[in-house]
């Protein structure tokens, strides 16, 4: 615990919080163009083919984004909306593509957690 005199001589350092998604430049989402759509494998205990896309953002950054949900319609030159949020078992993937926005279609036949996957409410859905 510093004395008052020590604080007068040298003030406390401000804590600088580093952004976990710097490519978004303090925005909630950013628009971008897919430059490459491919699959990659996760880290050690897990095994799968995860769908990812390399996206050139309007902020000038080129980032790797995860495509959530089952099936997608993305290809090169698709316009997508990118949000923050990393994928724990994919190194270097710190962004997600928003489903149901711009060129990205929502997940077909999705009945639960629909808002996260851009799926409309089915006609035969009962409350």
From Swiss-Prot:
Any GO molecular function: rRNA binding
Keyword Ribonucleoprotein: yes
Gene3D superfamilies linked: Nucleic acid-binding proteins
Modified residues (3-methylthioaspartic acid): 89
GO biological process: translation
Keywords, sorted A to Z: Methylation, Ribonucleoprotein, Ribosomal protein, RNA-binding, rRNA-binding, tRNA-binding
GO annotation, cellular component aspect: small ribosomal subunit
Keyword Amino-acid biosynthesis among UniProt keywords: no
Alphabetical list of Pfam families matching this protein: Ribosom_S12_S23
NCBIfam families with a match to the protein in the record: rpsL_bact
Purpose: With S4 and S5 plays an important role in translational accuracy. Interacts with and stabilizes bases of the 16S rRNA that are involved in tRNA selection in the A site and with the mRNA backbone. Located at the interface of the 30S and 50S subunits, it traverses the body of the 30S subunit contacting proteins on the other side and probably holding the rRNA structure together. The combined cluster of proteins S8, S12 and S17 appears to hold together the shoulder and platform of the 30S subunit.
Family: Belongs to the universal ribosomal protein uS12 family.
Subunit organization: Part of the 30S ribosomal subunit. Contacts proteins S8 and S17. May interact with IF1 in the 30S initiation complex.
Protein name: Small ribosomal subunit protein uS12
Organism: Campylobacter fetus subsp. fetus (strain 82-40)
Name of the encoding gene: rpsL
């Amino acid at each position: 615990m510093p004395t008052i005199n020590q604080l007068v001589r040298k003030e406390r350092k401000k804590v600088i919080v580093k952004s976990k998604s710097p490519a978004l430049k303090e925005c909630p989402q950013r628009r971008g163009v897919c430059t490459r759509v491919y699959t990659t494998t996760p880290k050690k205990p897990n095994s799968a083919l995860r769908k990812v896309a390399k996206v050139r953002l309007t902020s000038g950054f080129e980032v790797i984004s995860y495509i959530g949900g089952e099936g997608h319609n993305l290809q090169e030159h698709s316009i997508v909306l990118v949000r923050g949020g990393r994928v724990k078992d994919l190194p270097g993937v710190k962004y997600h593509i928003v489903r149901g926005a711009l060129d990205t279609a929502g997940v077909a036949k999705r009945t639960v957690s629909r808002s996260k996957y851009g799926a409309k409410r089915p006609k035969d859905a009962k409350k």
